[in-house]
């Protein structure tokens, strides 16, 4: 499989020469194993000025952000246990047997209890890898249960745009920090790490995953991934239609050879961290012109979201 060959290439490179040396052969300016190519950085540098234009180059990303945020919030809420003894949680599919108004009351009380418990929990720290102009970073920083967000990206112009845009919202003061740096230069550990629409733009995705995992809180930290399966449907929707026909995605944004199947990521975790992780959720997602981004259960086709929890 392609992803495994890219992973194995990292191992082979380490045996023959360091990752820095390998990049130094190609260019004298990039020598981090989690770096993107010069072409990738240049491409996103050109997109930086229109990053926050909802009708501009990133309009599809703006629409997708709502679905990404829903996926993150739902996953986190699902980890909150209902501790109020006054709330009865049936041990069966109550929606099939109880009246609708009873089901609605049960659901409402459960949600209220979850929100209350979530607000009482210690606030979480977030690392947004490949934050670009800060679309997801800002949304995460506005959540009440998030203490702070650190956004990193290799494109300096995107970081400048992110910093300037964050100044427009007083709520974000002290809650968000942006830096132009490689992932392996980040210190500390985080409760949540997001790596969304990023893996398909790097040469060594295994290095990104490895460094993300090492910076994830061992006490049940969660890694959120969002990328694209490598298949004909993905090429047709994202490259042929998205970039060339509809032109709703800037041309040159995607490369089929860099797409990663969801099964390949799970296989990599099983090979490297067997028994040390738990798959919390895996959903496919697709863009419908008159509806926006929606989730579905075919996670091995097109775009997908993945949430992986670290276990002790």
UniProtKB/Swiss-Prot annotation:
What regulates the activity here?
Answer: Regulated in response to catabolite repression.
Give its localization.
Answer: Mitochondrion inner membrane
> What cofactor does its activity depend on?
Mg(2+)
Q: What is its EC number?
A: 2.1.1.64, 2.1.1.-, 2.1.1.114
Q: What's an example GO BP annotation here?
A: ubiquinone biosynthetic process
The highest taxon in the source lineage is: Eukaryota
Tell me the keywords, alphabetical order: Magnesium, Membrane, Metal-binding, Methyltransferase, Mitochondrion, Mitochondrion inner membrane, S-adenosyl-L-methionine, Transferase, Transit peptide, Ubiquinone biosynthesis
Q: How does it sit in the membrane?
A: Peripheral membrane protein
Keyword Repressor tagged: no
Q: Molecular function (GO) terms listed? A: 3-demethylubiquinol 3-O-methyltransferase activity; 3-demethylubiquinone 3-O-methyltransferase activity; polyprenyldihydroxybenzoate methyltransferase activity
Name of a matching Pfam family: Methyltransf_23
Range annotated as the organelle transit peptide = 1-32
The miscellaneous remark of the record is:
Present with 259 molecules/cell in log phase SD medium.
Q: How does it assemble?
A: Component of a multi-subunit COQ enzyme complex, composed of at least COQ3, COQ4, COQ5, COQ6, COQ7 and COQ9. Interacts directly with COQ4.
What PANTHER family would the database entry show?
Answer: METHYLTRANSFERASE, UBIQUINONE BIOSYNTHESIS O-METHYLTRANSFERASE, MITOCHONDRIAL
Q: What is this protein called?
A: Ubiquinone biosynthesis O-methyltransferase, mitochondrial
Q: Which organism is it from?
A: Saccharomyces cerevisiae (strain ATCC 204508 / S288c) (Baker's yeast)
């Amino acid at each position: 499989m392609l992803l495994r060959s890219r992973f194995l290439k990292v191992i082979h490179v380490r045996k023959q020469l360091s990752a820095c040396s390998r990049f130094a052969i190609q260019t004298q300016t990039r020598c981090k194993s989690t770096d993107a190519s010069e072409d990738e950085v240049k491409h996103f540098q050109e997109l930086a000025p229109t990053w926050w234009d909802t009708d501009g180059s990133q309009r599809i990303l703006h629409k997708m952000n709502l679905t990404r945020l829903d996926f993150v919030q739902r996953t986190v809420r699902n980890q909150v246990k209902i501790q109020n003894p006054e709330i009865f949680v049936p041990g069966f599919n109550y929606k099939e047997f109880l009246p609708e108004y009873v089901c609605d009351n049960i659901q409402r009380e459960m949600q209220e209890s979850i929100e209350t418990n979530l607000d009482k929990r210690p606030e979480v720290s977030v690392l947004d890898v490949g934050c670009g102009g800060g679309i997801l970073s800002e949304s995460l920083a506005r959540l009440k249960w998030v203490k702070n967000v650190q956004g990193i990206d290799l494109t300096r112009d995107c970081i400048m745009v992110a910093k300037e845009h964050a100044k427009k919202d007083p709520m974000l003061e002290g809650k968000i920090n942006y830096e132009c740096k490689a992932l392996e230069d980040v210190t500390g550990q985080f409760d949540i790490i997001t790596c969304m629409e990023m893996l398909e733009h790097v040469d060594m995705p295994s290095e990104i995953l490895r460094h993300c995992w090492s910076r994830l809180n061992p006490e049940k930290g969660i890694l959120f991934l969002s990328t694209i399966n490598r298949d004909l449907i993905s090429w047709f929707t994202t490259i042929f239609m998205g970039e060339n026909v509809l032109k709703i995605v800037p041309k040159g944004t995607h490369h089929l050879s860099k797409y990663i199947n969801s099964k390949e990521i799970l296989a990599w975790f099983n090979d490297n961290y067997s028994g040390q992780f738990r798959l919390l959720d895996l959903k496919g997602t697709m863009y419908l012109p008159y509806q926006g981004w929606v989730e579905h259960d075919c996670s091995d086709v097109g775009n997908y979201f993945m949430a992986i929890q670290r276990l002790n």
